[in-house]
A protein has these predicted regions:
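Aromatic/basic-lined ligand-recognition segments
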Residues: 1, 6-8, 75-83, 133-209
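N-terminal low-complexity, intrinsically disordered segments
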Residues: 1-93, 227, 233, 262-264
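Glycine-rich, often proline-containing surface loops adjacent to acidic residues and nearby aromatics
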Residues: 15-22, 89-105, 131-139, 213-225
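Short amphipathic alpha-helical segments
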Residues: 35, 39, 107-114, 118, ...
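Conserved short hydrophobic interaction patches
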Residues: 46, 114, 118-125, 244, ...
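Short, highly charged C-terminal tails/helix-capping segments
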Residues: 62-65, 134-141, 255-264
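Hydrophobic alpha-helical segments and helix pairs
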Residues: 84-126
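C-terminal structured interaction module
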Residues: 216-264
Length: 264
């Protein structure tokens, strides 16, 4: 089962590792060339820390199919980073997108509230024509140790849509060197989801940081709405994607896992 109509539930032991919202728009060159001082002032109370980096842009290839195709290097893209005082929230602004991310997701309502003000300020100051892509990504990482489920097979915690090979009782779980599932699913006329699911290791970032040896289950759901979304409908588009994400998440897990995550 890929989708479930199980009621939306808030879990005390929620597995969300990172949540990212990104809205792409037709390029606004001013963002790349002029410091976003007015935008910073509008959001500075919530995102007081600022940094800027130059991201390498992919090269452009011209003359494909001809006798002498050329690879043209593109100028770097300025990525403006605004970070909350507690370092829990990060806002990125480039000439092509605005994005909000957090490693401490507590629920959709708070996430939407954190996005409201910067998104409204961005629309007011930069007046994008529309949003070409509205994206919402949930990277969920399930730890059996954290949930008190050590020794419980993944096949008992996740539905066969994501664990079909591991449902074979004759083959021990540790025999699978790779058992990942990658799907692209159409959700409705304008929405789709790219899903990666399966056991894996989560690498900790930073120099000399000790790595966690526990094998975890990763459920990475990257949902998007394409087509030209009017700015006034961006919030509604995100609500639609969130609704789809709930059905996908609940469709991936079993009642055994729901119990361990401790529904409120």
């Amino acid at each position: 089962m890929l989708f479930s109509d199980h009621p939306r539930t808030h879990y005390r032991n929620a597995p969300a590792h990172e949540v990212i919202c990104q809205l792409r728009f037709p390029s606004i060159l001013t963002i790349n060339n002029v410091e976003p001082a007015d935008f910073q002032e509008a959001i500075r109370a919530e995102f007081p820390q600022y940094a800027r980096r130059q991201d390498a842009a992919p090269p452009r290839i011209t003359g494909l199919g001809g006798p002498a195709p050329k690879v043209e290097q593109q100028p770097p893209v300025t990525n403006h980073n605004f970070v909350s005082e507690d370092n829990q929230w990060k806002l990125n602004l480039t000439k092509d997108f605005i994005a909000l991310s957090t490693l401490h997701y507590s629920g959709w309502e708070e996430f939407a509230r954190q996005l409201d003000k910067p998104l409204a300020a961005f629309i007011r100051l930069y007046k994008p024509a529309y949003f070409q892509r509205v994206g919402l990504r949930y990277v969920n990482v399930f730890s059996r140790a954290r949930l008190g489920l050590e020794g419980t097979p993944w096949a008992e915690l996740f539905t066969p849509a994501y664990t079909a090979p591991m449902q074979d009782a004759e083959l021990p779980e540790d025999r699978f060197l790779n058992c990942a599932c990658d799907l692209t699913v159409k959700l409705d006329s304008s929405c789709q989801a790219k899903i990666h699911a399966g056991p894996g290791m989560v690498k900790r970032r930073g120099p000399n940081v000790p790595q966690d040896p526990e094998v975890k289950f990763i459920l990475d759901m990257d949902l998007s709405m394409t087509g030209n979304t009017p700015c006034t409908l961006a919030a509604g588009a995100l609500e639609t994607l969130h609704g789809h994400s709930t059905r996908l998440f609940e469709g991936a897990i079993t009642d055994r896992l729901r119990d361990a995550m401790d529904a409120e």
